[in-house]
Amino acid sequence: MLIEWRAANANQPFRKLDHLSYTHIFAGNSFDRGDHERRDEELLKKMIQQDNTKLLPFHKLQPLVRRSPNAELAWIGHDFLDGLPEEAGGPKFLGFDADRTPHFAVDISAVEDPSKIAALASDAAFEDGRAAATDIPQEQSGILAQARANLNWHSQHRFCSVCGTESQSFRGGLMRQCPNCSSQHFPRTDPVAIMLVYKGDKCVMGQTLARQNSSFYSCLAGFMDQGEAIEEGVAREVMEEAGISIKNVQYHSSQPWPFPSSLMIGCLAEAATTEINMDPEEMTDVKWFSRADVLLALQEKNENLQLPGPIAIAHHLIKSWANHEF
């Protein structure tokens, strides 16, 4: 069966992502996620054992990364799987690369000595995913996001929310099903509206409670509510955090943020009112900044204003407005 499958799919066209207008770090994943193949549980088991299959281990949600000669995700073969404890949960299917090579991620947090697995790849170590994402190739950061978010979901949702029975992973990790009540559970993605509010040559930015007594400011943001359009979520969050009414909401771009599993929906919005009425339970400070001050901060030449770095969608929303790019 496996030989027949590989022969039939050897020349299958690979769907390369080339339609993204603005690709952030943690986006740009080029894998074909193999929706058809992941529905065949027996095929998945056989794919894991293929000689060319590649696995990306994570230890406490830190991916294995190789630093020499260039930073990249460190993929290894499947031989180490036989020694994994049962609580590791098994490999989760990520998809196929352009050569139709299957790729999986696996959580090895239950392993007592992860250095032995790290040693299976030359010059590799388990690293913080956020730090590694700025150094590895762009499309690999998208793979990292997919793998980290999925493994974290499995670790946090082992038990059925209906009856409490331990559930089982299916579809290569894209579903858990309860063996007792047959309830199906799917990985969650939490949508977040993040927006830069502007009026002429000024924009509004805020400082959260975690950043108090610093010069760090960023876009306003908040989780979307159920039954809420993106534009409505933007307006609500701006009103809640800054007390400002807005109009002319424009979509800019989006960014997966796998800490743990958010989708940042980036927008720009024009202020309809300008008086700030900040919510002190959410924010330390909210204020207007001039375009000139923002441009200096983007060049790291403004000691009174620090902005998010390029890893974050907030940086690109701010930069887009400051440079008249929207």
Regions found by a protein language model. Name each.
Residues D97-R100, K199-D201, T273:
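Short acidic-glycine loop/turn motifs at beta-strand connectors
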Residues S218-S253, C267, T273-E275:
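The catalytic Nudix box helix
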Residues L2-H157, Q168, Q212-Y217, D279-F326:
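Nudix hydrolase/Nudix homology domain
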Residues W75-H78, M175-N180, V249:
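Short Pro/Gly-enriched beta-strand edge/turn motifs at strand-loop
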